[in-house]
């Protein structure tokens, strides 16, 4: 029942709207307008302090038949940069790309458009369906700020399982595991002295930092854990023993205990190096989001797999090395599976999206909304 031409036209329209993280207001207004044109009630949620945006989250509930568990759908309105002045084109090969030196914006306007098309299709064809709550978030790319802000208004959310439409890979891909993510920020303060005349009177912050890093387990720590140094910064004259070095690193793990062990290990290395050199250490650990892991035999996954198969699409489960709004929703106690929607080469000017994947994503949402074979959408 999906209108394929309308779906594509809406995608072309939406990606032309600038909505880099923090500047989603115009995109919020457009989606809100399109949903209200269907007679739907739309709630604005989240303040600028929590969402880090000049826009807001949008919540829209499409009431369905009683007695069937509701389904939550989620997609984010923001994009990464360069995402201003996007000119989408559909190639003869059926693949959508950006004409200019920008991203395409399929991440995540593919998911946004598919959700809006579901609302329109249910309006056009009022068949029995389960209650579906549409959640459009802001600030996902910059830190899942919009999704995290939902926690303050938890009562606005339906009680059910969720589908997040924000994974690379084809329709049929179900991300059921993703890591938690923590950032370690540190400043090492040494003591300046003349590098030629009084080198032993100084304490090199650079040398201290390098010794700490050399002692760290980095890269692929184990099958569930990774760690990386993003910044090791020190600027100064060559004739001065460097007194200040900045250190920023991350750790990710699908295991909560392993994530803590890795960040503890990294800070222990910093402490030991500073103790040895006599430098001072100031550090903080910021936990950006928690990981999640859904059992492969969960009834919700079996239901989703059945829907995909009924469409002639082969379902498969996967793990992700990055985070999404699914992390935030799972942390709130809402089981959320992140679905592949077809986007490839995301976060780059080579981003692509096959039109057939956009269409199949919208078709899947239609089937999920009207599917009443199980009650496994209940959490």
Model-derived regions, located:
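Active-site metal-coordination/substrate-binding segment of hydrolases
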Residues: 54, 61-63, 67-136, 153, ...
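Zn-dependent metallopeptidase/amidohydrolase metal-coordination segment
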Residues: 7, 232, 243, 313-375
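Glycine/charged-rich beta-loop-alpha catalytic/anionic-binding loops adjacent to active sites
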Residues: 90-103, 187-193, 311, 343-347
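Acidic-enriched catalytic cores of C-N bond-cleaving enzymes acting on peptides and small amides
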Residues: 198-233, 240, 257-280
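N-terminal capping segment at the start of a domain
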Residues: 1-25, 287, 344-348
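A non-catalytic alpha/beta surface segment that caps or lines the substrate-entry region
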Residues: 20-67
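Acidic/histidine-rich catalytic neighborhood of metal-dependent amide-processing enzymes
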Residues: 100-179, 221, 226-231, 237-239, ...
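A short beta-alpha structural unit
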Residues: 12-16, 228-235, 250-254, 280-301, ...
């Amino acid at each position: 029942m999906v209108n394929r031409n309308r779906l594509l036209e809406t995608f072309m329209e939406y990606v032309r709207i600038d909505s880099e993280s923090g500047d989603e207001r115009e995109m919020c207004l457009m989606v809100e307008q399109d949903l209200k044109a269907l007679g739907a009630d739309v709630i604005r949620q989240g303040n600028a302090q929590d969402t880090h945006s000049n826009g807001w989250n949008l919540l829209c509930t499409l009431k369905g038949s009683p007695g069937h568990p509701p389904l939550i759908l989620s997609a984010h309105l923001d994009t990464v940069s360069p995402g201003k002045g996007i000119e989408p084109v559909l190639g003869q090969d059926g693949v959508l790309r950006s004409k200019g030196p920008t991203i395409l914006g399929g991440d995540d306007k593919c998911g946004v458009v598919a959700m809006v098309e579901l609302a329109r299709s249910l309006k056009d064809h009022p068949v029995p369906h389960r209650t579906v709550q549409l959640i459009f978030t802001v600030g996902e790319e910059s830190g899942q700020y919009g999704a995290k802000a939902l926690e303050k208004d938890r009562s606005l959310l339906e009680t059910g399982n969720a589908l997040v439409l924000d994974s690379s890979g084809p329709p049929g891909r179900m991300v059921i595991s993703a890591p938690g993510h923590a950032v370690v920020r540190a400043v090492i303060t040494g003591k300046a002295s003349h590098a030629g005349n009084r080198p032993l009177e100084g304490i090199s912050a650079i040398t201290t930092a390098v010794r700490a890093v050399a002692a760290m387990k980095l890269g692929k720590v184990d099958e569930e854990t990774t760690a990386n140094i993003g910044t090791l910064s020190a600027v100064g004259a060559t004739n001065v023993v460097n007194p200040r070095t900045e250190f920023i690193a991350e750790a990710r793990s699908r295991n909560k205990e392993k994530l803590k062990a890795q960040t503890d290990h990294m800070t222990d290395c910093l402490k030991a190096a500073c103790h040895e050199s006599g430098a001072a250490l100031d550090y903080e650990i910021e936990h950006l989001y928690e990981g999640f892991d859904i059992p492969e035999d969960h009834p919700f996954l079996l239901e989703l797999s059945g829907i995909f198969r009924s469409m002639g699409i082969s379902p498969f489960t996967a793990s992700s090395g990055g985070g999404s709004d699914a992390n935030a929703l799972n942390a709130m106690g809402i089981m959320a599976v992140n679905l592949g929607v077809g986007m490839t080469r995301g976060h780059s000017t080579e981003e692509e999206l096959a039109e057939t994947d956009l269409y199949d994503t919208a078709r899947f949402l239609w089937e999920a909304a009207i599917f009443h074979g199980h009650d496994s959408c209940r959490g």
